[in-house]
Structure formats: C-alpha cells, structure tokens
C-alpha cells in the first residue's frame, strides 16, 4: 500500500469520528435542555399547587404506621394507611412504636397504645392473671379462712399486706394485720348490713363481708391495690382526650380531676370518696370504741386518715385515757417537740369549739389499740352504755347535698358593679374625726391626749392641702374607690388565717376577719357598728374600767347630717368602733405617732411592732371575773381552790392543766383550738400581740385605709412559765 492510500483512509476515519463526536454533543445538549425543562415545569406546578387555595391541607397524623415510620414517610390516622394500600401490604400495617421516655422504660409497649388500646390491654392482662390464678395447685390457699378475720380474696400480683396470717394475734393490732381489698372499680360496693363475729376476748366484735363481696367475680377486683393505668378508677374517657400516650392522657385527666374538685367537696365527704385506708367502702376497718364496722354511722378513721379532719362542731368530747389507756401517751410524747400553735376550723357555724385534746385528730392519733396487758382497761369500757359512748354522725347523701347547698349560698357573688350603683353620697370623714377626738378626750389623760393631738396635727395641713380642690363628685368617687378596694380585700381576709382588720383613715373599722373576732372577743357586728357596744374594758390598771362611765352610751351613735354641709340629705349611719378602742393606752399613742410618719411618707412602707389588744368584756363578765379574782386571792393566802387541788393531785390531760382561776394552761406541743384563743388575756383583759400594718392611698394620694395583720405572742409566756417550773 502506498503512503498516499494510507493517508486517505486516516482522513476518512478522522472525518467519521468528528461527525460522531458532534452528534454526541448535540444529544447531550438536548438531554440537558429537556431535563431543565422538566425541572422547571415541576417547580412551576409545585408552586402553582402550593398557592392553590382549594388544595386540601394534609392533616398531621397522631402516630405513623411501622412501614411509614421506617421510611420517614408521611402517614395518616387510618389503618391501613393509603401508602400501605398502594404498596400492597395493607395487612401488615400497624402503629409504629415510638421511643420511650426514661420514665416509661419499664412500661410494656401495649400500655403505650393510643386511645382505648391500653384499656383493652389492661383488661386482657387482668383476664390472664385470673386464668393463672385458677390454674394453680388445688392445695394452694386461695382465701384467708379464719372465723376471726375478713374473708377477702387477695390479688395475685400484689403482696403489700401479709397473706400468711390465719388468726388474730394477741399483739398490737395494726394495719399490717388486715389483707383488705382496694376498690379499683367504681362498681365496688360493700353491703351496709353486715353480720358480726367474735374477734378475741379483748376485742369481741367484728364484721364479715357478704358472699358477693368476699367472693368477687373473676376479672372484677383482681388487680393491684392501686392500678394507675385503669381509667375507670376516676371515670376518665381517654379516647376523647386526643392523647397519643395512655400515661400522658391519664396524667392530664388526673390533673383536671384535682383542679375541678378543689373547693367543691366538703371535708366530711372528701375522705369518703377516696379508696384509702380507713375510708368508707374501702374494705378496711374503722375505729369506734371496741368494734370494727363498715357502717358509715359507726366508722371512725384509722391512724391519720383524711376523714379524721371532720368538722370540729360535730365531735363529742372523748376521754383519751379511758379509750386508749396507757398507749395514749405515745403520740403525745412524739408531739412534745412540736411548736405551740392555734388551729381554727374552716367555716364554723359559731366560734365555739372544743379544746385540743377533744379534736378528732387528737383522739384518733394513737397508732395502737389495747394489747393483752391493757385488756382490762379496754374491757371496762364495754360496761358503759352505748348512748354514752362516742358516736360518729351518719354521713348520708342528703346531708352532703345540704352541706354543699349551704356552702354555695355563702359564696359572694363576684360582681363589683353594684358598688358603683349603691354609693350615692360621700363619706363624712369630718364627722369621723370629731367622734375620734371626743373619744380620745374621754378616755385618755391630758398628757396622753396631747401626744396623740400632736401626731394628728402634724398631718392635718397635708389633709387640707389635698382635699381643698375636691368637689362632691370627687368625694363620691373617693368613696367608690374605697368600697371597691374593700370588696377586693374581703376575699383576702376570708382566705388568710391571720387575724386581720381594715379601717379607714379615721380609725373606724371597715372590715374584720373571724380570726380577729375569736382572738379579741369582739363580734364583727359590734366592730362595724351594727350592734351596740357594751365593752367596759379600757385597759386600765385592773384591766377594766371602774366607775359609772359606760361605752355603750356613744357607740353606736347616729350620724348627724348637718356636720357635713355638702351631704345634708345623707342617710344617718351608725358609728363603727375605732381602732383606738381595741388597743391599750401606750399602743394607741405609738400607733398614731407611726401613722403620722407613714400617712404621707413612704407609700409602700409598713410598720411592724408589738401591741396589746383589749378583750371585749361586758359589765356582767367583769363582775364574774372580779369574783374569780377574789377566789384566786383566797388561794394565794393558803386556801387552795378545787382546780388547784386537782392540779396538785396531777389531774391533767396530756399536759394541759387548769389553774386556780379556771383558765386552761396549754402545754408545749399542743394545738389549741378556738377555746384556747379565747383564753388569751382572760385575766387582765389584754392580749400581747405583734402586728404589722400599712397605709393604702387612693387616686388622689390621700390615705384611704389601713390594713393590719395581728399575730399572738405565745412563745414568751411559754418560755417564762417554763423557767418558773424549773425554779
């Protein structure tokens, strides 16, 4: 082959290769353009679909199925979901398992299912437990059989109480001696007519359940003592709560149950609705003398149950020594380190209450019954007639409904608009200051009157400067502000357990709490001027006013409309009690000197100091007290009174003794009730207190009202008495 022929073939090959390369580049370029076009069209269609308002929005599913969860795909609530149907394995579509929280690691997966799945799991679990219990050996005891015991069936998966006891021991009876069944279902009821059997020579009475209660149907009561996963315990509808987690729905429902039940259930009913130890219908035992009963008319609380805090007005006096014997001192010894305190019931019908050792909490606080060594003292109580023994009031549904009705009627209607409609005239502060001046001149000596007058004179120019530009409408608005603020403080006074009073800038009492009335003996109606004031205690050397001067002659005093020229047509009003009438001489002087500094000074300031409150005493009470003082003087001269003789002989109860004046002395660690508060200042008519008060101003920056909180100084008398006993 010649060189010229070879060169021609190579040139032809090069031409063909160039054409192929050009065709390939054109094909690649066309593919790229087509890809860009398709992507652009997809973006345009997606943008158009996103902006389309008629396009349905995808609803977020509560829980994805297992396949969609593994593929991180969007799922729906229906089962099988649409993706599983399209992919052809709809039979295997089921809810996916979420990652457990740390506090749910021990919970089974079935219990974490959404909706009612967990409830069905609990029912299947209960049924399985029943099958396992029925397949046990015939020789295994299924019931605790004893003539002296409750024939209750014990749950197979709860071993909180011992199950191997076959008879009542002679030792101390405690809660571990009972294998009772907890009511985990609302349908659980105990018959009220129960037969009695003998327990032991020292405890002769007992009760036994009816056959229906002793042998419950399978699957009805065989669960744990308190199953938190059972929504039927509180009638929760978990399916309607839209929770994906059973435990979360139950917790949310429990919080709602607690929040909606606050303040709606009376104390005597709140304990009877819970399935706790010692409550009504719980299969446990109550204490009433020497018997165990399921009847609500005879049931008393065991240990420190909630039903032990019943209303004090429904409790009869009980001698703890005759009821519990020597074991009554066990709890008293444990309470010796507790601080001295006063307790007031929530909503009493009156201010009369028993002493601390007569309260239901104190009578049921002993953790033991009589043992064999003290059986004689326990059997001696059986000779007492039934009418003389303590009987708990029957708690029935009509009484509870009536109690709820009374509570609802006492609630104040939350509507402040009536204040703006009722206030038509301004309040006559001028008449109030005139009455205060007359009272100060009548009660105090000239030297003390001068000190009070100097304190009031220092703030008088400020009062004149702030009120000289106010017209009648401003004064009416000022009174509306006062009434509106007082209306707001009434809820605080009722909710606060501290003795509280509210008075105007003239010192006239405008509001008072029941604790203050219990402490001082001043009735609310007397303090507000709605009833006559017959107090004769002015804090003198003897504690009482001597002579013919009487306080009832000027309180209540009709209001003179001519004193205030701008309200000539105002309705006459009665005169409330002044704050100065509640304090002794030194406390009154100190109060007005502090008031002169704080009235137009620090608007957020307060005063905290000590004072002596005067007890409310009438002429008849003063005569009785004078007679008791004579007996006390006779006792000091060597003639011991009957109370002092009893005290020397050691006739006291739990450390609370009575002195020669018939006044009860409360020992350390006791909680005195209203009776103990009434005894404060019984002899000299003065109650040593520490109090904190502040001045609240109105919109015109004028002192509007004085809010005062009082606290008893009971620690110092206890300390001084302890030093006297040591010496």
From Swiss-Prot:
Q: Which residues bind DNA?
A: 65-93
This protein's GO CC annotations: nucleus
Output compositional bias ranges, type Basic and acidic residues. 39-55
What is the superkingdom listed in this entry's lineage? Eukaryota
Any coiled-coil regions, as ranges: none
Write out the ranges of the annotated region (Disordered): 1-62, 129-224, 264-297, 353-399, 533-567, 627-666
Which SUPFAM superfamilies does the record cross-reference, listed alphabetically?
Zn2/Cys6 DNA-binding domain
Recorded hits in CDD domains, A to Z, give:
GAL4
Q: Which GO terms describe its biological process?
A: cellular response to starvation; gluconeogenesis
Member of which family?
Answer: Belongs to the ERT1/acuK family.
Reported function: Transcription factor which regulates nonfermentable carbon utilization. Activator of gluconeogenetic genes.
Q: What is this protein called?
A: Transcription activator of gluconeogenesis TRV_01442
Q: Which organism is it from?
A: Trichophyton verrucosum (strain HKI 0517)
């Amino acid at each position: 082959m010649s060189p010229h022929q070879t060169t021609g073939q190579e040139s032809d090959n090069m031409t063909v290769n160039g054409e192929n390369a050009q065709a390939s580049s054109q094909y690649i370029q066309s593919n790229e353009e087509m890809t860009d076009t398709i992507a652009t069209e997809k973006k345009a269609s997606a943008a158009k679909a996103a902006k389309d308002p008629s396009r349905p929005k995808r609803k977020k599913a509560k829980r994805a199925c297992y396949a969609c969860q593994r593929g991180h795909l969007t799922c729906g609530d229906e089962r099988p979901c649409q993706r599983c149907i399209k992919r052809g394995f709809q039979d295997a579509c089921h809810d996916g398992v979420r990652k457990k929280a740390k506090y749910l690691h021990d919970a089974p997966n079935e219990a974490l299912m959404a909706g009612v799945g967990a409830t069905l799991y609990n029912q299947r679990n209960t049924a399985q437990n029943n099958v396992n219990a029925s397949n046990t050996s015939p020789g295994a005891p299924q019931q605790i059989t004893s003539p002296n015991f409750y024939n209750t069936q014990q749950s197979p998966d709860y071993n909180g109480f011992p199950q191997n006891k076959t008879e009542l021991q002679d030792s101390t009876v405690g809660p571990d001696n009972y294998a009772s069944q907890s009511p985990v279902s609302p349908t659980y009821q105990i018959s009220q007519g129960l037969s009695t059997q003998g327990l032991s020579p020292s405890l002769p009475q007992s009760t036994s359940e009816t056959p229906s209660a002793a042998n419950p149907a399978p699957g009805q009561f065989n669960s744990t003592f308190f199953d938190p996963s059972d929504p039927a315990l509180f009638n929760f509808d978990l399916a309607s709560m839209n929770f994906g987690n059973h435990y979360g729905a139950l917790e949310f429902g429990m919080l709602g149950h607690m929040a909606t039940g606050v303040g709606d259930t009376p104390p005597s009913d709140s304990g009877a609705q819970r399935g706790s130890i010692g409550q009504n219908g719980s299969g446990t035992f109550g204490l009433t003398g020497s018997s165990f009963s399921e009847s609500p008319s005879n049931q008393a609380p065991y240990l420190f149950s909630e039903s032990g805090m019943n209303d004090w007005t429904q409790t009869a006096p009980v001698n703890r020594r005759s009821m519990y014997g020597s074991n009554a001192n066990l709890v008293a010894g444990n309470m010796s380190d507790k601080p001295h305190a006063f307790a007031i019931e929530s909503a009493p019908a009156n201010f009369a209450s028993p002493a601390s050792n007569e309260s239901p909490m104190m009578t049921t606080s002993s953790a033991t019954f009589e043992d064999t060594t003290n059986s004689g003292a326990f059997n001696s109580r059986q000779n007492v007639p039934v009418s003389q023994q303590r009987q708990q009031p029957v708690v029935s549904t009509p009484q509870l409904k009536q109690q709820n009705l009374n509570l609802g009627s006492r609630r104040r209607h939350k509507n402040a608009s009536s204040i703006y409609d009722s206030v038509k005239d301004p309040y006559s502060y001028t008449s109030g200051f005139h009455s205060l001046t007359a009272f100060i001149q009548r009660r105090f000596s000239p030297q003390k009157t001068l000190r009070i007058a100097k304190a009031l004179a220092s703030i008088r120019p400020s009062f004149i400067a702030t009120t000289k530009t106010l017209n009648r409408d401003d004064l009416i608005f000022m009174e509306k502000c006062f009434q509106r603020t007082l209306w707001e403080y009434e809820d605080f006074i009722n909710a606060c357990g501290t003795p509280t009073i509210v008075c105007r800038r003239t010192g006239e009492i405008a509001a008072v709490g029941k604790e203050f009335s219990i402490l001082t003996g001043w009735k609310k109606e007397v303090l507000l001027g709605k009833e006559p004031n017959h107090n004769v205690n002015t804090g003198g050397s003897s504690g009482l006013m001597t002579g013919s001067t009487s306080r009832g002659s000027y309180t209540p005093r009709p209001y003179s409309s001519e004193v205030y020229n701008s309200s000539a047509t105002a309705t006459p009003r009665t005169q409330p009690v002044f704050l100065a009438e509640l304090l002794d001489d030194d406390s009154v002087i100190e109060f007005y000197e502090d008031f002169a500094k704080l009235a137009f000074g620090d608007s957020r300031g307060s005063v905290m100091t000590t004072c002596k409150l005067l007890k409310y005493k009438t002429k008849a009470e003063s005569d009785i007290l004078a007679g008791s003082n004579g007996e006390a003087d006779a006792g000091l001269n060597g003639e011991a009174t009957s109370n002092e003789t009893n005290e020397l002989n050691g006739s006291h109860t739990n450390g609370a003794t009575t002195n020669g004046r018939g006044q009860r002395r409360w020992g350390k660690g006791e909680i005195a009730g209203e009776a103990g508060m009434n005894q404060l200042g019984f002899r000299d008519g003065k109650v040593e207190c520490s109090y904190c008060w502040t001045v609240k101003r109105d919109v015109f920056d004028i002192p509007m009202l004085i809010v005062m909180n009082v606290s008893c100084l009971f620690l110092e008398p206890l300390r001084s008495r302890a030093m006297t006993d040591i010496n």
